[in-house]
Amino acid sequence: MNITRASLPMLNTTCSCRREKWNFLGRYEGTFDYWIGLHRASSKHPWMWTDNTEYNNMFVYHMNAQCLKKPEEGESSPGTGGVHSYKILQRNSLRAISPESSAKLYCCCGVIMVLTVAVVALSVALPATKTEQILINKTYAACPKNWIGVGNKCFYFSEYTSNWTFAQTFCMAQEAQLARFDNEKELNFLMRYKANFDSWIGLHRESSEHPWKWTDNTEYNNMIPIQGVETCAYLSGNGISSSRHYIPRIWICSKLNNYSLHCPTPVPV
C-alpha cells in the first residue's frame, strides 16, 4: 500500500476498504486528504471501484452514515448530480466531493485510453527476442496480525500503557524488542503513526554519564538528540525524550520481517 503526498487527479488511485486497512488509513493519513478509488457516472448510478465492482456501502452501513461528512457551506451535497468521487478525510470519515467539471474527468480518461492503445501498438511493432521466463516463487514472511510492515521490519503499537520494563518483556514474548529505528524513514513513520501518544522505544542507558544503547546493547548513533537526563527513551511530540522507567506509557515493538526473493530468470528461446 502506498500513500502519496503529491496532489494528483483521481485516476488510478485505489483503496481496499477492509476494516483493518481502513483503521490503518484513518490513523496514518493525518491532516491530508487522499483520493481513493470510488467513482460514479452520476448521482443516479451506484458507486463503483476502479475495477468496476460495486461498492457495498460498508461504512454507511456500519457507521450509521457518520462517515459521510456534512458538506460545508457552498459545497455540493451527497445525492446531487455533480458528486462523483469519495476521498478519505481526517478523523476517519469519507466525504463525497464535486470535481470542477465532469468533462475534465472524461477527457482525462480518453487521453489515457489513447495512450494505452499507442503503447500496446508500439510494443507489438518493435522487434523483440522471444524469451521464456522460468519463474521461481517469491516467498514472503508477512508481518503478524496487528503488526505493520515498513521496509524490512514489522512494528506493533500497544493499545494500553505500562512501564518500560514490562513493555520490553511484552515485546520479547512476541520474539521482538522495544522499537528500534535505523534511518529517518522508520523514525518518521513511528512519529507519525504513534499519533499524540508518548511511546516507549528500545533506547536506554545506565545513567546520564553513559551512552544510549538499544536493547541488543548496540550503541545509539545519536541520529536524533535525546532530551532529558533520565535512563529510558520514548517518542514524544518534541522528538525523543527521556524518562524514568516506571512511568506508564504505550509502547512500540519491532522485529525484522525476513523474506526471500527470487527473481525470474529469462531464458532465450
From Swiss-Prot:
Induction: Constitutively expressed in bone marrow cells. Up-regulated in vagina after 17-beta-estradiol treatment. Down-regulated after removal of ovaries. One of its GO terms (cellular component) is extracellular space. Disulfide bonds join 171-253. Detected in vagina, eye, tongue, stomach and spleen. Glycans are attached at residue 163. It is found in: Cell membrane. Residues 129-269 are extracellular. It comes from the Eukaryota. The chain crosses the membrane at residues 108-128. Keywords: Cell membrane, Disulfide bond, Glycoprotein, Lectin, Membrane, Receptor, Signal-anchor, Transmembrane, Transmembrane helix. Residues 1-107 are cytoplasmic. InterPro entries: C-type_lectin-like, C-type_lectin-like/link_sf, C-type_lectin/matrix_domain, CTDL_fold, NKR-like_CTLD. One of its GO terms (biological process) is negative regulation of osteoclast differentiation. It is a single-pass type II membrane protein. PROSITE patterns: C_TYPE_LECTIN_2 (PS50041). Signal peptide: none annotated. Residues 150-254 form the C-type lectin domain. One of its GO terms (molecular function) is carbohydrate binding. Inhibits osteoclast formation. This is C-type lectin domain family 2 member G. It comes from Mus musculus.
